[in-house]
Regions:
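Contiguous segments within soluble domain cores/interaction surfaces
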Residues: 1-133
Length: 133
């Protein structure tokens, strides 16, 4: 997956769909994902140095008013100017920390996405000055 954003930009918001793989109990997965903590990390592809390390991300229903009652979730991250101040190619990952429903202080597990392919983030060079004087 490739996501592009301009240098010093804060939009567009990065969005990734959470797919159900069919290997887990759907109801349990929905309960776990509704009570999880999402974070985002991004590192430079060449140097391996983290530009963003475990900053808060959000989980939301893609379509809260779905007529069929299906729940499709998306994970989102809002970039800051500090996140995008250096042009280049970066690798991004979301981490979902799922908490045990019976004991909310215990971690049930962690899910790192994307699973099937890398998330490449291209921060494109920009000549526009973004600060308003």
């Amino acid at each position: 997956m490739i996501f592009s954003i301009r240098q010093n930009a804060t939009l567009p918001i990065l969005k990734m769909k959470v797919f159900r793989d069919g290997r887990n109990d759907f109801r349990r997965f929905e309960e776990l994902i509704e009570n999880c903590v999402a974070t985002f990390a991004m590192k430079d592809e060449k140097t391996g140095i983290y530009k963003v390390a475990n900053k808060a991300a959000n989980i939301a229903l893609e379509n809260p008013c779905d007529e069929n009652g299906y729940k499709h979730y998306i994970i989102t991250y809002q970039f800051t100017k500090d996140d995008t101040d250096k042009p280049g190619i970066f690798l991004g990952e979301f981490k979902l920390t799922l908490f045990d429903l019976a004991n909310p202080t215990q971690v049930y597990g962690e899910l790192i996405a994307p699973i099937q392919e890398e998330l490449y983030i291209h921060i494109l060079d920009s000549f526009v000055k973004t600060d308003i004087v």
